[in-house]
Amino acid sequence: MNQPEVELEDLGLIDYKQCWDYQTKLFDASVQLKIKNRKFPENRVSTKNHLIFCEHPHVYTLGKSGDLKNLLIDGPKRKEKNISFYKINRGGDITYHGPGQLVVYPILDLDYFFSDIHKYLRLLEESVILTLADYGVTGQRLDGFTGVWVDAEKETPRKICAIGVKCSRWVTMHGIGFNINSNLDYFKHIVPCGIEDKSCLLYTSDAADEGL
């Protein structure tokens, strides 16, 4: 069986809402095409797979099951610091995106790969763990939580990559936020992912220097 093609796009630094709208356009096109293919299988057209790389200006996003109490900074202070905020349609709680963080949005039709959202999440984690390993950093999973951590076996594990997705008819959107050279001060204004007793970590200034 031939491997499905995936189109890669590097959007650079892009406004969160602009990128979210673009994701939604691609996602909706695939979902609607799958609905049409089911109704008219004789005229079936293949869906397209996309892998979007980008960075965002400072923004907090709250997932559909998130708790607004985990946003610790009010509107006037966000405006003063030039931080946007959006309630969005992915899973998970609150997170931060900003310059120095690699954001990856896979818009994939999982019917080409496997129909298992839990496997998909674990493979997203694995892609980050393997990337970190290439640079001598040990990334790990933490039981009961989605994402990638360092010091997972210690009392205060630190999160280096957050993951939150949406999936409908086995089409995915949203994805990962990988802290490479982010300003971690922005995480002080939220309870990241709604987890009070954990902290966040950078790849460059923390993990690499410590040789984790």
Q: What is the predicted function of each stretch?
A:
Residues 1-157:
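N-terminal lobe of the biotin/lipoate ligase/transferase fold
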Residues 138-142, 173-174, 185-190:
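Short conserved catalytic/interaction loops centered on acidic-Pro-aromatic/His motifs
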Residues 160-163:
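Histidine/acidic-rich helix-loop-helix segments that form or flank divalent-metal centers
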Residues 171, 176-179:
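Conserved phosphate/anionic-ligand binding catalytic regions in large, soluble enzymes, centered on
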Residues 181-205:
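A hydrophobic, small-residue-rich beta->alpha segment in the mid-to-C-terminal subdomain
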Residues 206-212:
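Single conserved hydrophobic/aromatic residue that forms the stacking wall/gate
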